[in-house]
Amino acid sequence: MAKNDKINFSTPSGFPEFLPSEKRLELYLLDTIRRVYESYGFTPIETPAVERLEVLQAKGNQGDNIIYGLEPILPPNRQAEKDKSGDTGSEARALKFDQTVPLAAYIARHLNDLTFPFARYQMDVVFRGERAKDGRFRQFRQCDIDVVGREKLSLLYDAQMPAIITEIFEAVNIGDFVIRINNRKVLTGFFQSLNISETQIKSCISIIDNLEKIGEAKVKLELEKEGINPEQTQKIIDFVKIDGSVDDVLDKLKHLSQTLPESEQFNLGVSELETVITGVRNLGVPDKRFCIDLAIARGLNYYTGTVYETTLIGHEALGSICSGGRYEELVGTFIGEKMPGVGISIGLTRLISRLLKAGILNTLPPTPAQVVVVNMQDELMPTYLKVSQQLRQAGLNVITNFEKRQLGKQFQAADKQGIRFCVIIGADEAAAQKSSLKDLQSGEQVEVALADLAEEIKRRLT
């Protein structure tokens, strides 16, 4: 590199990095999510960031996602090794774009080592060639859970998902939210009753999934472009706009099933939906936390039954903050047997970005430390180290200032980091086994015996 060449240290577009205050918020949310996942018996796994490209693209799983391929970058004197790197053809590698396809590959690799139903959680970073813009990232963390069965999987696992979503978002206190539930069989069965072809049904579901985003008028235009006639289009719009309480919607669907021709798929979907709703209620989820929304379709083609989207009440423009559903064939296609599954995903990076911008969440102080032991004189460092260790052993997070600076500057540095307490020990205090405890939050300063220091700080923290 020439002397005058300057390195561009800006992050690549779409690849976020966090200040300590932001990273601590992410860790807090990750810990909360993990605790809830584990309370339901989900076990952690980790899959490689890199998968074989043929795995990621198998059975059309790539969808519309742009995959980041990997190719080794060799120094000029090693270019001859490039053809031997094994990164072409079936050995081509790429970064994973979600965690569902890698889960399917993971189960295929470890089928005989796992117990089914297999309930796992994974909170990893994934990569997509998204158009980088506000709230959209090319690298982001997803917090996923899935339950996968062999041959069959109880619908009560579907019912468990809203209970888990409710516990997580109530724990992080982000305000009122609602989990919108539907069943793809209800939609498919209704479209079949209108004599819409299977190929058209897939397109219709994707279009309906965008109803909230693009509006009714554009949905009608898109449906008509797919060859849906005006009468069918209006019936579809009227159907997905059915609303009311959960019981009202179920009653309307049951009544409708009596009038629909070829309604076997529709009836099965309504029955599954009712089973899931009953399970959600039995798990103690309040009715205010969920509803049936017939416009929720989840555009991904691998969903076959229950689908979910979660929105913040009053902040619907933020979009879904947690979504998922049931799939019958996604995992099984890798293995050659029926392996139904159900899961949800929280796109944590995007969620944090949106909630911070909306003022719904605030960052945490940049350090977990609650206490600073200030440096009054270097000769007392043995005392400072001993006191710091005693406070840590009592369960407090402590920084010891090893460099001596003006006391005011030490206070300023502690306050800037959001640290509440400063422990001040001069020669006289050390001789008397006492300290001055300064509360930077209130400005109060009190004398405390060293033997009582930990308990006094903990008392003030509660």
UniProtKB/Swiss-Prot annotation:
| Protein EC | 6.1.1.21
Q: What Pfam families does the database record attribute to this sequence?
A: HGTP_anticodon, tRNA-synt_His
Its localization reads: Cytoplasm
Q: Which Gene3D superfamilies match?
A: Anticodon-binding domain, Bira Bifunctional Protein, Domain 2
Which GO MF term does the entry hold, naming one?
histidine-tRNA ligase activity
Q: Name one GO cellular component term.
A: cytoplasm
Which keywords accompany this UniProt record?
A: Aminoacyl-tRNA synthetase, ATP-binding, Cytoplasm, Ligase, Nucleotide-binding, Protein biosynthesis
Reactions this protein catalyses: tRNA(His) + L-histidine + ATP = L-histidyl-tRNA(His) + AMP + diphosphate + H(+)
* Gene Ontology terms describing biological process: histidyl-tRNA aminoacylation
Q: Please, which domain of life does this record's source organism belong to? A: Bacteria
> Would the keyword Ligase turn up in this protein's UniProt record?
yes
Q: Mainly resides where?
A: cytoplasm
The record's comment on protein family reads: Belongs to the class-II aminoacyl-tRNA synthetase family.
Its quaternary structure?
Homodimer.
Supply the HAMAP family for this chain.
His_tRNA_synth
**Would you tell me the protein name for this molecule?**
Histidine--tRNA ligase
What is this protein's gene name?
A: hisS
